[in-house]
């Protein structure tokens, strides 16, 4: 049956999708920041672009791996003679639940707080650059001055 395989695969695929999306949005914000704020710098080469994409997927795969590793596919007895199949998280030393909590908190920081800060900073710098930008030839045009 596919139950045990999907028990490990589905949470991993979900986590991987979220993580690679978050990292990709952060990389896009950083690239836009670089292109607008430092527009005279050289372009990123194709090789570097592929390296960044590969790193985004690799880091995402690594960060999502605990979602596949720490799973348990088992029968749970609800009442005598009635069992259900369940796919649950099974962290080592689960009596205190510390590993699952640590993973969740680190995921919150790495996948929400840090990208939010980086993206906000990048777009704030872009906004500041564009707000203070004067187009060539428009410096003496009173219509464009604010």
UniProtKB/Swiss-Prot annotation:
GO cellular component term, pick one: plasma membrane
Family matches, as Pfam families: 7tm_1
UniProt entry keywords in alphabetical sequence: Cell membrane, Disulfide bond, G-protein coupled receptor, Lipoprotein, Membrane, Palmitate, Receptor, Transducer, Transmembrane, Transmembrane helix
Disulfide bond annotation, renumbered to this chain: 7-87
Principal cellular location given in the protein's record: membrane
Chain ranges passing through the membrane: 9-29, 50-70, 101-121
PROSITE patterns tied to this protein: G_PROTEIN_RECEP_F1_1, G_PROTEIN_RECEP_F1_2
Bilayer disposition of the protein: Multi-pass membrane protein
GO molecular function: neuropeptide Y receptor activity
InterPro entries given in the database record: GPCR_Rhodpsn, GPCR_Rhodpsn_7TM, NPY2_rcpt
Extracellular side: 1-8, 71-100
Location in or out of the cell: Cell membrane
Cytoplasmic side: 30-49, 122-146
Function: Receptor for neuropeptide Y and peptide YY.
Family classification: Belongs to the G-protein coupled receptor 1 family.
Cited PANTHER family: NEUROPEPTIDE Y RECEPTOR, NEUROPEPTIDE Y RECEPTOR TYPE 2
Name the UniProt record assigns to this protein: Neuropeptide Y receptor type 2
